[in-house]
Amino acid sequence: MSKKYVYLFTEGNATMRELLGGKGANLAEMTNIGLPVPQGFTITTEACTQYYEDGRKINDEIMAEIMKNVEKMEEINGKKFGDLTNPLLVSVRSGARASMPGMMDTILNLGLNDDVVRAMIAANPTPEFERFVYDSYRRFIQMFSDVVMEVGKKYIEQLIDAMKEKKGVTFDTELTAADLRELANQFKAE
């Protein structure tokens, strides 16, 4: 049997910190004691080691295990990635065996895309919800651009600042849904 690289939160516990990292072990433990933790999974520290050994590539075995667990998560949560009526949105958080506050990356709202955003807004066409959805999408693209695509945070912040200046506002919260949609499109263009 091959090595296990992915654990649902229900499969881990607090003693597995070396394998699951601090966040993964704690999420598993919170699940075990019955706290209301949305179901998810942890990719092990051994998978990270293998990723580096494979030249910074996720090998087929690990990818298959990740996809199998995504399917389990979809089933458990009753949602599906890319579904226009009931999309699954997840947070991706990096972790380590030891606590490193402020050093680990996060991507929120993985699962949002242009089609999902339009469908969500069509299902609840209020100005407040439209702004909320576009702000979430803008934040997702911003985090993804920084963490995955390695587009510098400073550059992204310059785009946001330019939009605020163009609109004559001081705070991100003063940007409209249309402004946030335009920012999301600018981020994707980069």
What are these regions (language model features)?
Residues 1-190:
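Nucleotide/phosphate-binding sheet-loop regions of phosphoryl- and nucleotidyl-transfer enzymes
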